[in-house]
Amino acid sequence: MNAPDKFTSLLSLTREPFPASHKCLIPGSRPDLNVPVRDVLLTNGETVSLYDTSGPYTDAKVEIDVRRGLPGVRGAWITERNDTESYEGRSHQALDEGLKHAHDHDAQRLAELRAGASALQRTPRRAKAGANVTQMHYARRGIVTPEMEYVALRENGKREWMAEYLANEERAKRVAGNPMGASIPRIITPEFVRDEVARGRAIIPANINHPEVEPMAIGRNFKVKINANIGNSAVTSSIEEEVEKLVWAIRWGADNVMDLSTGKNIHTTRDWIVRNSPVPIGTVPIYQALEKVGGVAEDLTWEIFRDTLIEQAEQGIDYFTIHAGVRLPFIHLTADRMTGIVSRGGSIMAKWCIAHHKESFLYERFEDICDIMKAYDVSFSLGDGLRPGSGADANDEAQFAELRTLGELTQIAWKHDVQTMIEGPGHVPMHMIQANMDEQLKHCHEAPFYTLGPLTIDIAPGYDHISSAIGAAMIGWAGTAMLCYVTPKEHLGLPDRDDVKQGIIAYKIAAHAADVAKGHPGARSRDDALSKARFEFRWQDQFNLGLDPDTAREFHDETLPKDSSKVAHFCSMCGPKFCSMKITQEVREYAAKKGVAEAEAMAEGMAQKSREFMAGGGEIYIPIQPAS
């Protein structure tokens, strides 16, 4: 099967619209600014509108050809600013796919993949001489861009349906969240988005060479976002599988995706992914740079790394993880750790520093990196190369020395108006999580925090998506802006599509729990809508309002598969006689019939049962009468 056919076959499994759902567009101030949301039609006639990350893939009305990529929704916005220029760009080299593969005998296969990707190529753009094209640069000059308006509309969504669930003032006050120092307005305006980006408290990752991206914001005063990692390795996965993983990930709610490919055809894989992604794409450029020198860390040079940054910026990568905080003076601090340096990027740079006994070129050349970033509006994700790899190493001096350095680098990036977020751990026991957030806010000036979990315990291989989602929910409530998912395969192997889904669902739970705890406007309304459906035994609505309708329906149908069970006033947990919600409904119906309050109905019912008990002789144990 050739590549395009395989793409089509794989994506056909991933493009199914969600049940009882359709896309709806929220119009902006201009004809080409429309924000998609997912409307769920309930069986009682209500409609619930949900934030949607799936792009056009779940829209049955849209035809998608992955060989041509998605439409460039931001193309006109970028062009009309008149501060960028098209140019020829660097030529693709065999070395871009990795040194080993530049010398292998698979040239024909590589040529086929490149030919298949040729229709995806866009002529790259960059800032005109002396210009700065970052969203932070515009924001600091008081300009509200279409991207900022898009974010505001997206964060607000359609709130009309929430009115019923927000009307009870007593309940709203009782369950109101604690924002933990965040400043979340009731309504997100474009001006608020601009101000948050200008302050550096939020970023909108949106490379000018990724016009297909649907703008989103990462910041503690916005919804908590999640990131999913995909990417091949030297031993497994193909380009087709990685593109399908991308579409699968955003279907289930990934707000961002990182391509962490370290195997063959790295450049070509990225072409396919970026051109077909409606969400921001991030990378760790040092991985590809290492491939270019055959995997020998000490052979890395600034020139090779710089060329890799430009290569990826031209392709449209929206944010780079750069481990510029791994400095020579810090490496000895990891010597007594239980698990040493566990970050791949961190270990690469540590090895380079030790081999040359020199300061990291990422640190020394940081301002040169800023010049590249602001020419394409690539955001920094300042990597935590010295993050703890076990609970025993949490919050040590190596971790916090690097964090303080990342704060210093943030100030340098902001001097160039480059958008910046800070990466965090890792492995942190529950009682040490708040200290991580406190230190980050103290030293990194409220730049968005982006954490990998953290895992709260180390004894759950195969279940690390659960052990880490606990920490993710806690640190998300404390102020982390984006959570990097962990799959069941963490520490064990490369995740497949089912692992990706499980990791995303676990992290959607964590992110939503954090939003509810923070009191994010409207966050709890979806919970209330599902709770109402549950109480009213609207099973289909329960399934369809959940994070994973497929699994909910499957679990229900394992014991009650008949269609009649979808309207039954009980489930297999309690059965028809002991369903608490059914009993409560009967009490309410009895009260309504008698024209009394629920409490009175309960009292009357108890009195009636008392009379029946006494009339029966007042005996606790009644002899069984033989059947006549």
UniProtKB/Swiss-Prot annotation:
GO BP terms, alphabetized: thiamine biosynthetic process; thiamine diphosphate biosynthetic process
Catalyzed reactions per annotation: 5-amino-1-(5-phospho-beta-D-ribosyl)imidazole + S-adenosyl-L-methionine = 4-amino-2-methyl-5-(phosphooxymethyl)pyrimidine + CO + 5'-deoxyadenosine + formate + L-methionine + 3 H(+)
GO terms for cellular component: cytosol
Cofactor(s) of this protein: [4Fe-4S] cluster
Binding site for substrate: 229, 258, 287, 323, 343-345, 384-387, 423, 450
Listed pathway(s): Cofactor biosynthesis; thiamine diphosphate biosynthesis
This protein's record includes keyword Ribonucleoprotein: no
Quaternary structure and partners: Homodimer.
Similarity-based family: Belongs to the ThiC family.
UniProt name for this protein: Phosphomethylpyrimidine synthase
Species whose genome carries this gene: Variovorax paradoxus (strain S110)
